[in-house]
Amino acid sequence: MHYFVLASDYDGTLATDGQVHDETIAALERLKDSGRKLILVTGRELEDLLRVFPKVDLFDCIVAENGALLYWPSSREEKLLGERPPEEFVKILRDRNVNPLSVGRVIVATWHPNETTVIQAIQELGLELQVIFNKGAVMVLPSGVNKAAGLKAALDELKISPHNVVGVGDAENDHAFLNLCECSVAVANALPVVKERADFVTNNRRGAGVVELIDRLIASDLEELATQIKRHDILLGSQEDGSEVNIKPFGTSILLAGTSGGGKSTLAT
């Protein structure tokens, strides 16, 4: 088994209108029974997720608030990966009638067209904050906090390499964590730019697309995709005709032969 972690977005990927269908839950259970791990990577605040999705115990870890919070369902432990923006920032948004406005443990979120007011407040206060878009959602987070950073923190605690992870998502805020994963998958309803960058696009939409992916993952470990996933290949050099020679970063054995001092150690490192 090469891929033993599935990292999935929630809204628009696992869930339709905030709800996960029974068929999708059954597929997640099959994946767990295969010996693999599940990580949920979502922009939702944890309390909101727990309210709409009672099956969080299926997941080994939840990356919430777009990468700002780790939650371990088995122990109910939480770990913050950033600091909430100052209260003065939140006060300005409220004084300027930004609505809706949600303030999580770290994330501050609203919706289009409030991004102009949000950016103006950041500039006025001289804050080092970033604005991340998720379709109509506008999320404010500390610099460097995103779904990729959150997923990497979860994988580090699990002692698992991103090379062993399949990621699936649908929206622009999924780009970072999908790029981290060895294999990136877009569900059929994903934004065109997400599909363009994905290694594989499912035939089905939302939860049905995740079911499709899980069935393929269990059946073949996605071996049929190995030759088309080249994003993480390592360049060794070029042949006489100028064509590149690349190898996979895993599962490849190479014999280095030559005289002492010929550069074998340099090439290997």
Segments the model singles out, each with a brief description of its role:
Residues 86-181, 189:
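Conserved acidic, metal-coordinating active-site core of Asp-based
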Residues 55-58, 65-66, 125, 180-181, ...:
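Short, structured coil segments at secondary-structure junctions
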Residues 7-8:
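Active-site T/S-Asp motif of two-component receiver
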Residues 231-269:
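Glycine-rich phosphate-binding loop of nucleotide-binding enzymes
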Residues 17, 22-103:
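Active-site phosphate-binding/coordination module
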Residues 1-2, 34-35, 249-251:
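Short loop/turn elements that form and flank the Walker-type P-loop nucleotide-binding site
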Residues 1-3, 21, 148-230:
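Mg2+-dependent phosphoryl-transfer enzymes with acidic/Ser/Thr/Gly-rich catalytic loops
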